[in-house]
């Protein structure tokens, strides 16, 4: 039985919200290269890709602080040093995304959902300046009507503000929505928003199995959401989706737009 059949018997969700890094794309090679360039420029030893793989998931500022600390706990890192290091990292990371790849099954799944008329959004803790160009480079940006970066709103995951925002903008309730991610932050945000959550086992999650975070469902291939797509005789052969008409234009949510809806969103503000 497919993931959708288990989570939404007899129907499909009307809205699917996705995380980005560790869910749709493997960006760690580029992130690790930027982290190592940053550390070398500061006279430090490089961290290496495996360490960076365990540090990602909470946004660039936290990644940089973990790199400076050499581990998950970054409480001892000096704020001034971290701010300077972040500037160095952002410049290094913005220079290249050549090592980033889309995970197997992602394009097939997005294409299938688009064909079924399911609305899709992207909610990531990655700084918004990198998100749209990266999606375009990976050729998957056209599938998302709402794109929210980690610095778009005042809050980022695990706060559910972005999920509430997208559901408000789409007019689709939590009961007909789904969040797909790979980390504890994703699961906590989905639970706080009252949304079912699919956890992907191949993601990052700081080196811990995603099942430990108790998402609604755990899968190891995004195509397992789709009824019958991974049956022995099944094969997805969908044509490329047409560009969205102007009435369904992609919305890259910016800080200016956020200020216009802050009053509507405030009543959903999550308090830990």
UniProtKB/Swiss-Prot annotation:
The keyword Transmembrane does not apply. Mg(2+) binds at residues 19, 21, 182. Keywords: Carbohydrate metabolism, Hydrolase, Magnesium, Metal-binding. It catalyses: 2-phosphoglycolate + H2O = glycolate + phosphate. HAMAP family: GPH_hydrolase_bact. NCBIfam families: HAD-SF-IA-v1, HAD-SF-IA-v3, PGP_bact, PRK13222.1-2, PRK13223.1. This is Phosphoglycolate phosphatase. It comes from Pseudomonas fluorescens (strain Pf0-1). The lineage of its organism: Bacteria, Pseudomonadati, Pseudomonadota, Gammaproteobacteria, Pseudomonadales.
